């Protein structure tokens, strides 16, 4: 099993215990997760993400067989193209981009330029809808949730773009998916970490209507319990239990323009 969602490093708005590679590997062993793309959590809030990316590369260097870096690239920051080349040299599996935290909207050409450049290098972009529910956020955490319009704009940026959207709920997934053409839908994968299981059964409904091939396993560790997505899969109704989820590692191998 593969998880494209975890991060290491501290979270600025509350204490997170042991957000380090050794703890992550222990969680992965317990949950049967073979490999992961790993981001650097505090870099989402940095103006210059270079130091955070450097720390990520160094910290994961001893675990590259299982933990591939997913560095944070800001297209509004000078020399982001060099940061993209550094990501390639470091063996990155994907890139992380945080439009709400950077006050970048759906019409920002810099986001589309980055998405196209990443696609040319066969690097998916990981978008995070939210870190926490709006009701529990710190007063200083003023960024809103990632809007569906931004996801749609990036999915339409080019045939080579690939997106993994983390922490989306049923309403946002339906809004975005049914607003895209069939070809554009194939460029987007959704993780299941924020999709409700019983009694609402949102996950089952989405698997029936959109298809299991558009969803990937995800924990959003260390901000969420890694056991929750596995429990939701085990509690699926019989007609969708055992439906094979996609593997984000194969996004470009299975590319549909």
Residue ranges and their predicted role:
Residues 93-94, 107-216:
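Catalytic pocket-lining loop regions of alpha/beta-barrel enzymes
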Residues 5, 28, 56, 60, ...:
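Conserved, mostly hydrophobic/aromatic
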Residues 34, 47-133:
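Active-site gating/metal-coordination segments in enzymes
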Residues 42-43, 75, 99-101, 131-133, ...:
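Active-site-proximal loop/turn and secondary-structure-junction residues that shape catalytic pockets
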Residues 2-7, 18-35, 209-216, 223-257:
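Mid-to-C-terminal alpha-helical segments outside catalytic/metal-binding sites
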Residues 8-19, 44:
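Acidic/histidine-rich helix-loop elements
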Residues 1-4, 37-40, 70-72, 96, ...:
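Active-site neighborhood of phospho(di)ester-bond hydrolases with catalytic His/Asp-centered motifs
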Residues 5-11, 128, 167:
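Histidine-centered divalent metal-coordination motifs
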């Amino acid at each position: 099993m593969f998880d494209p969602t975890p991060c290491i490093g501290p979270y600025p708005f509350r204490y997170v215990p042991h957000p380090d590679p050794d703890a992550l590997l222990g969680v992965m062993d317990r949950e049967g997760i073979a490999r992961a793309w790993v981001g650097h959590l505090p870099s989402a809030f940095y103006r210059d993400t270079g130091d955070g990316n450097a720390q990520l590369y160094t910290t994961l260097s001893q675990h590259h067989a299982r933990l591939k870096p997913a560095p944070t690239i800001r297209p509004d920051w000078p020399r982001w193209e060099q940061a993209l080349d550094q990501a390639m040299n470091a063996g990155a599996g994907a890139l992380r981009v945080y439009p709400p935290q950077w006050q970048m909207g759906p019409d920002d050409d810099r986001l589309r330029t980055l998405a196209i450049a990443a696609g040319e290098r066969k690097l998916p972009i990981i978008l995070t809808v939210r870190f926490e529910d709006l009701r529990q956020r710190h007063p200083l955490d003023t960024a809103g949730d990632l809007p569906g319009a931004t996801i749609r704009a990036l999915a339409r940026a080019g045939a080579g773009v690939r997106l993994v959207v983390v922490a989306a709920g049923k309403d946002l997934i339906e809004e975005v998916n049914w607003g895209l053409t069939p070809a554009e839908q194939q460029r987007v994968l959704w993780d299941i970490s924020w999709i409700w299981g019983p009694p609402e059964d949102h996950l089952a409904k989405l698997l029936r209507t959109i298809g299991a091939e558009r969803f990937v396993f995800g924990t959003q560790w260390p901000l969420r319990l890694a056991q929750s997505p596995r429990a939701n899969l085990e509690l699926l109704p019989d007609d969708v239990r055992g439906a094979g989820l996609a593997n984000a590692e194969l996004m470009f191998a299975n590319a549909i323009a």
